[in-house]
Amino acid sequence: MKTQEMLQKEEALERRIESYWDARSPKFSAVRRRELEGSDAARWQKFIASHLPEKKPLRVLDVGTGAGFFVVLLTRMGHEVTGIDMSAGMIDEAQKNLAAFGCRADLRKMNAQQLDFSDEFFDVVISRNLTWTLPDAMEAYREWHRVLRAGGMLLNFDSDYGETTFSAADARDSVHTGIGEALLIECNKIKDELRVSTHRRPLWDADLLEKLGFSVQYDADIASLVHGDESLRYDDVPLFGIYAKKVK
């Protein structure tokens, strides 16, 4: 059980994380729009579809939706999608992108670790590049398990950034060019305070999810399957994919 001091520290960290992503949201959204307008959107859509139940429409929760990339793809696929993010700036960007691409979905500002949904409400929970940013990834996984129906699927795409130090040089050479030095410093400081950064992933995630009641499969690196647009250069840290079915 968390002490009052631990809770206060976590809340302060959450505020820093929220402020960081608010500041990043406009340029981050520009990258996601480039993805949606380019060939990677079709790659992601095909890859996601291969791991979804055949039923349509599925009730899908996109956790840490950011600028709404997955929301756009999944609504195009005919599903009922709710996208949540702790950053108000990201939710604003997601709303703009949904409008730009002619999509409709339910977008809400919400903490990924404290979901305002009833038990077994969703068929699918999906997330991209979120869990490495969470103060308590374990609690988030518990919540995602709670809101999934029996037999539902959790798809998580993320990277193990624990031992990575983000630099201005790397940012200049990637899709995230233009991140200021102050934001990079804050990003590294936040990352180094997160417990998830001490774990080796996705092995840690798979072990935890199995204990929570999932049947788990994963790929150590799916980047070559979803990143093919040569105009978009990402970092070299492997992008893993976790596919977990709720069995109990």
Model features per residue range: what roles?
Residues 61-63, 67-114:
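Class I SAM-dependent methyltransferase SAM/SAH-binding core
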Residues 152-159:
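Conserved beta-strand signature within the Rossmann-like core of class I S-adenosyl-L-methionine
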